[in-house]
Each structure stands twice: as C-alpha cells, then as structure tokens.
Amino acid sequence: MQNVNIPVGICNNRIVFRSLGFALSENNLTIEVLSRPIESLGRVLLFLYLYPSFAADYAQRYYGATWNQAYDISVRSLAFLLPFLFSPAVEWAVGPVFKSFVPLTELLKWSLAVGYYPTFPGSRQQLPSVPYDVNYGVQSTKAATVKLLRRAMLDDCIQSKTRLEAMLERGPDTFRNVLKAHISRIDRFTSSSGWHVADDYHMDLVLDISSGISRPSVHDNISFIQRSMRRISDILYDLCVPAHFLDLWRFTGLQCFWIDPNLGKF
C-alpha cells in the first residue's frame, strides 16, 4: 500500500483545508465550517480517517502499528462512525451539513472500542481488544467500553434525541437521502472501481439503527449497540470504502493541494 502525504496550511493552530470548506483545530480537535458549507459527508469522514495526524497517528501511538496498518484500521472502522451521526458528538447546522465534531478523539476511540479489529495484511495478529487510553490505562473490555460510551454519548443523550427528532421534522428521510445522494454521486465516477450504489434497504437500516442508538434507554444495553454496529458495518463497508483507495483521492478532489498562507480571515 502506498503512503499518501497531504500538504496543508497551518494558521492560528488550525489545519485549514479551504477547498473542502473546513478546518481542524489542533487545540480541541474540532471541525470548523469556514466560508462555505461542507458539501460531502463522506468526503470529510474519509479525509479525517486518512489524515495521519488523527487516525493513523492514533493507531501508531497506542498500538505500535505501521502507517499502512493504521490506514487499514482507520478506513475499515469508518463504517462504525455513521450510526453516530445523531450522537452528542455531532452538531448539525441548517440542513444536512455538519457544523462540528466534539470531540473528534472520542469518536476515534469509540470506533475502535466497539469490537471491530481487522487483521492486518500478511499477519494473523489483530489489534488488542481494549484500546489503551493514556488517561486511564488499560482496562477490562467491559469497563473500557462503558467508560468510552458514557464519555462519548451518555452525557448528552437527551439533547441528541431532541436534535434527531428536529432534524427528521425538517424533511422525510433526510439522513438517508444525504448519504444515498453522496454515494450515488461518487458511484457515477467510480462505477468500475469498487463502489456500490446504496439502495433503500441500506439507508433504512442505517436510519433505524441510528435512531435506536439515540434513545437513552438503549445505552444500558451495550451488547445491543455492539451487535448493531457489527451488523451495519457489513453493509456500509461496501458502500463507503472503494476497492482501490487511490480512486478516492482522484475522484473526490482530495489530491495534494497547497493552502494559501493568507488565511487569517478564517
């Protein structure tokens, strides 16, 4: 697998991606919407998971993985993030557009904690079953999962449910249509590269599980969440990950680009 280096612009402790319309703050690891809204949900999520300072560096630091292995775990864990679009970690702006991720590191930890650890190519060894947190140390699977779940979601589950209901009131099947439109748009350019068009069954499943996870009562049943995440990952993996990862960079406009250093206005 080939490494991909992404030249970016740094200003005011932020990594700015003007072409994509957002910036990553190095201080609190949040996303800021800049001059124009984020046009592609999948583009932002995939970009975050491909960017070494976040996903790859996290896997390298805490698991001793190589960059290629870190890329592998990052992309394969992407499917687990989609049901959490309605969690307190995500704030919605007007319409189907992200405003911020708060905090990004917790989503990364949670996506690793739900139990999906792919085998690295050429090796039978898998990632450990418990993520190592420098603040808490290694813990049992149950204790670590509960702690991550509460830190990432439980503290604001009522607000999450309220946000979900408000979003659904703005229009029928908003989330399903957003994700379906994105995947279909990409598929037009990459029909021979491993992408699949999402149908109503796929989108209904995503929406149903997302709604279920957003209900406070469900948080008491961690095994339900784990089963739901594993179930949905089997479908979303084909929908969200191309057969050849370089196609992603070519067809979603994520080629290497330099940022104008004059970005103080953002």
UniProtKB/Swiss-Prot annotation:
Database matches in InterPro entries? Virus_P0
Q: For this entry, list what GO says about its biological process.
A: symbiont-mediated suppression of host innate immune response; viral process
List UniProt keywords, sorted A-Z. Host-virus interaction, Inhibition of host innate immune response by virus, Suppressor of RNA silencing, Viral immunoevasion
Q: What does this protein do?
A: Suppressor of RNA-mediated gene silencing, also known as post-transcriptional gene silencing (PTGS), a mechanism of plant viral defense that limits the accumulation of viral RNAs.
Q: What is this protein called?
A: Putative suppressor of silencing
Q: Which organism is it from?
A: Poinsettia latent virus (isolate Euphorbia pulcherrima/Germany/Siepen/2005) (PnLV)
